């Protein structure tokens, strides 16, 4: 543990941020998983609804710096392609 008062405060705020960020990352994973489950079930409308709910959340987390913009783009691109493939099957 830190000895200097400012260092102690930094350690506490760092811990608070870590907990909040891990919760937010978990939320992102949950939303992506919901879309993947909907895709696997073959229900296009459910998959599209889940995708529409996921997109703004991922975008807001990119703006906050929680995930990299390329990772968010990759998530959205891959999942949208998989949703489009549902109708072709």
From Swiss-Prot:
Keywords on record: Ribonucleoprotein, Ribosomal protein, RNA-binding, rRNA-binding
State the Pfam families in the record. Ribosomal_S20p (PF01649)
GO CC terms on record? cytosol; small ribosomal subunit
Q: Where is the composition biased (Basic residues)?
A: 16-26
The Gene Ontology biological process annotation of the record reads: translation
Sequence segments annotated as region (Disordered): 1-26
The entry lists its GO molecular-function terms as: small ribosomal subunit rRNA binding; structural constituent of ribosome
Question: Please, which domain of life does this record's source organism belong to?
Answer: Bacteria
InterPro entries assigned to the protein according to its UniProt record, in alphabetical order: Ribosomal_bS20, Ribosomal_bS20_sf
May I ask which residue range the UniProt record assigns to the signal sequence? none
Among HAMAP family, the record links this protein to:
Ribosomal_bS20
Q: What is the documented function of this protein?
A: Binds directly to 16S ribosomal RNA.
The family line of this record is: Belongs to the bacterial ribosomal protein bS20 family.
**Full protein name:** Small ribosomal subunit protein bS20
Q: Species name for this entry?
A: Buchnera aphidicola subsp. Acyrthosiphon pisum (strain APS)
Q: Gene encoding it? A: rpsT
